[in-house]
Amino acid sequence: DVVGALPKALYKGDYDVRVILPNYTCIPWEYRGKFRYLNHFYMDYGQRSENMFVGIMQYEYEGITFYFIDNEYYFKCDKPYTDSIRWDIERYIFFCKAVLAAMPVIGFHPDIIHCHDWQTGMIPVFLRSTFASHSFYWGTKSIMTIHNLKFQGVWDIKHFLYNTNLPRYMFTPDKLEFKKDANMLKGGLVYADYITTVSETYAEEIKTPYYGEQLDGLLCARSRSLRGILNGIDYTVYNPETDPKISVHYTVKDAVEKKKEAKRALQRNWD
């Protein structure tokens, strides 16, 4: 919802907002069938001897340009996430590096790369390490947004070393190491220029041991770069006056009674 609605809101403010996603084969064909091929290249990935294919597909939707990183080995799937966190970590490390490698090919130099949750956590890491010497990326900043702190992308350091080809000194407690393993979200929180989360209240809560999911110390250390921004919704989609997915429409004037009717209709559908 956020990646769908936020770009539309920013676009109205005359910002050039673009979105990059994996080209999951489980994306409905009504959309995938309209993707157009833009370009492709081969990218070194981790400590492998052969380079990996990276395709770039493009799609325009409601004024926003979407790019899709294509690689069937990683993104041919029935659902975005699998039952293997080890495999998903390998897939998303690939995605993170491919996103940065694709930008010069696309010809788009963003001022800010906005990353969401652990699946994109390696983008700020790569931006400040592997890609730091490339002049194309100079001046580009990164923001890491936490939607759900519980999920962090944690696996053993050896797996991360093989798939990132980063130096061993980056896997220390002040960087990517987390209880002798490696942590993708932690990497993003350490290396991002700024951190946001879904509300001001949650931004304060995650700095405490109870809500901090063992990252509260890091979040306290970065508190000057941490801000809560309340989630909004797209009123053109979630509008009870016009939403075709609810049985009873209502406005603020009759919401109390009509919402009860809508709830009863929903319950009848599940009887």
List PLM regions with ranges.
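Catalytic cores of nucleotide-sugar-dependent glycosyltransferases that transfer UDP/GDP/TDP-activated
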Residues: D1-D271
